[in-house]
């Protein structure tokens, strides 16, 4: 069982990197299941969903979840799971649960399931917190919950990558704690 995390900004190439890795594993016989999240609420989002559909290899199985927790039961044990993307999953959960105090425990439960599930897992997530402080409470809650989940996943992951301009920065071997410089 391996856990691999791809984090980065919008349109950085996270999904492409995850799909490329999953495709390589599928050539070795792995069954690939991609869990995607989001509501086609407007034309831009519909176009985005369709673009992702056409980008995925035909032999990938896809779970298009419209509820934050419903997709978990549909994931076969032992399959290579690609979660694309954790930020969209959190947004879906925040739409379901209007109370921030109810969002965090449910999201923590989903993240815990991702970490513990049998089978290899690739997680695509959004890097948050490098911009201005969001003006609205919901934006701050989203940033805080996702930022914490990203840190937990990266610490648990066998490999973690920051994707910038289509390039991968391997975070796995980077220090997790600061140290004083040597004298």
Set out the residue ranges of the language-model regions:
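Charged, low-complexity C-terminal accessory regions
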Residues: 1-10, 24, 29-35, 159-183
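Generic beta-sheet signal
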Residues: 2-6, 32, 79-88, 119-123
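Conserved P-loop
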Residues: 2-75
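Residue-level signal for inorganic ion chemistry
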Residues: 18, 52, 82, 126, ...
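Short, flexible active-site-adjacent loop segments at beta-strand->alpha-helix junctions, enriched
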Residues: 38, 66, 86-87, 127-128, ...
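Helix-adjacent hinge/juxtasegments
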Residues: 54, 58-105
């Amino acid at each position: 069982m391996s856990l691999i995390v791809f984090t980065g900004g919008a349109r950085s190439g996270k999904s492409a990197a995850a799909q490329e890795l999953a495709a390589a594993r599928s050539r070795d016989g792995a069954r690939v299941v991609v869990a995607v999240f989001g509501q086609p609420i407007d034309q831009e989002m519909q176009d985005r969903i369709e673009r992702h559909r056409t980008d995925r290899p035909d032999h990938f199985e896809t779970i298009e979840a419209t509820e934050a927790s419903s997709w978990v039961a549909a994931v076969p044990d032992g399959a290579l799971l690609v979660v694309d993307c954790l930020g969209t999953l959190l947004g879906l959960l925040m739409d379901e649960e209007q109370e921030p105090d109810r969002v965090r425990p449910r999201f923590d439960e989903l993240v815990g399931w991702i970490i513990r599930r049998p089978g290899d897992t690739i997680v695509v997530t959004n890097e948050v917190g490098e911009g201005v402080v969001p003006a609205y409470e919901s934006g701050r809650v989203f940033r805080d919950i996702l930022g914490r989940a990203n840190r937990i996943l990266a610490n648990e992951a066998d490999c973690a990558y920051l994707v910038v301009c289509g390039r991968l920065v391997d975070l796995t071997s980077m220090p997790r704690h600061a140290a004083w410089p040597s004298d």
